[in-house]
Amino acid sequence: MVDLKTKAFDIAQNFTISLDGPAASGKGTIGLILAKKFALKYFQSSIVYRQLAFNCIHQQIDITDIDAVIALSQELKLDNNIDLENEDIGDIASKIAVISEVRNNLNHNLINLVKTTPRIIMEGRDIGTVVAPDADLKIFITASPYVRAVRRYNQLQAKGKTCILDEIIQQIILRDKRDKERKVGPLLPALGAFIIDTSKLSAIEVVEEVTNYIKNKIT
């Protein structure tokens, strides 16, 4: 059996990391740094839900029409030329993500991607519990709602987008509630996950903690 340290640092080995956590916990930044450090393909699973949300808006589909949303999820194709980093799109994505059939349809594609990619880090809400339960390393990161809201606020401000901090805080609290209470793939740490609170840590510090965990993990 190949140990975790060898899988991580030997690029000839297959290596899968699941990176889960709530909205704006720092998953994206941390995931990209880890991907570069360990020569992994990085994939953000929320993109498929945001793409579906965008398609619902573009095709004027009422998201309360469950059958229509499910049908649209069966033929989803990603468009890399679209800016999906929008709070309205994110809010709709969170709402349609609670639909069991939608999650099953989109997760099928995500599972195939994990299985066919030798070295990958996939980031989301239920990667370690549903999409890649056999991942070599399962990470769950979190932070307080206020800290996460400030991070999201700063991200949007940097992009020149108008936003109100209090509204972002409420959106994050509501999104957390939906994520934790949905029937399929609720937000929770996977069994055996390395759990990190990033409230007082920079992305680099989190990566250092993950690296030390890998080096010292006894399998």
UniProtKB/Swiss-Prot annotation:
The lineage of its organism: Bacteria, Pseudomonadati, Pseudomonadota, Alphaproteobacteria, Rickettsiales. This is Cytidylate kinase. ATP binds at G21, P22, A23, A24, S25, G26, K27, G28, T29. Pfam families: Cytidylate_kin (PF02224). The keyword Kinase applies. Belongs to the cytidylate kinase family. Type 1 subfamily. NCBIfam families: cmk. It catalyses: CMP + ATP = CDP + ADP; dCMP + ATP = dCDP + ADP. The gene is cmk. Gene3D superfamilies: P-loop containing nucleotide triphosphate hydrolases. Its EC number is 2.7.4.25. It comes from Rickettsia typhi (strain ATCC VR-144 / Wilmington).
